[in-house]
């Protein structure tokens, strides 16, 4: 389970972006983060995936505190961020782009099984 509690982050003291964000996502659960442009959706995901360090709050994954853990350590736990738009690999298929984060710890059968489940839910 991924649990985010009281997450706060900003790009400067004058520009807070995340103010007391909290949510849970169970294993195998698909969760959507919704909001308008500039609301902090991508910042939240970058913070959870270790690309940004929160000012305050905690992030736990399966009971382990991963708050402030470097992105590579978070990736080894199985959490990764699929980049948006121009950050995708244009020569790769959707399947290949989505499975990039899994290559560090899962075998090809596990990757295929997981992505097949996503394809069924979102054809």
Which residues fall in each region the model found?
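Conserved structural motif at the start of ABC-family nucleotide-binding domains
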Residues: 2-4, 17-18
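ABC-type ATPase nucleotide-binding domains, specifically the catalytic core motifs of the NBD
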Residues: 12-13, 31, 69, 94-113, ...
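Short coil-to-beta microelement around the adenine-binding A-loop and adjacent beta1/P-loop entry
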Residues: 14-16, 72-73
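ABC nucleotide-binding domain signature
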Residues: 32, 75-86, 116-118
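The feature captures the beta-strand-to-loop junction immediately N-terminal to the Walker
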Residues: 34-36
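Helix-to-loop junction immediately C-terminal to a conserved catalytic motif
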Residues: 49
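Conserved ABC transporter NBD signature motif
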Residues: 57-64, 77, 110-115
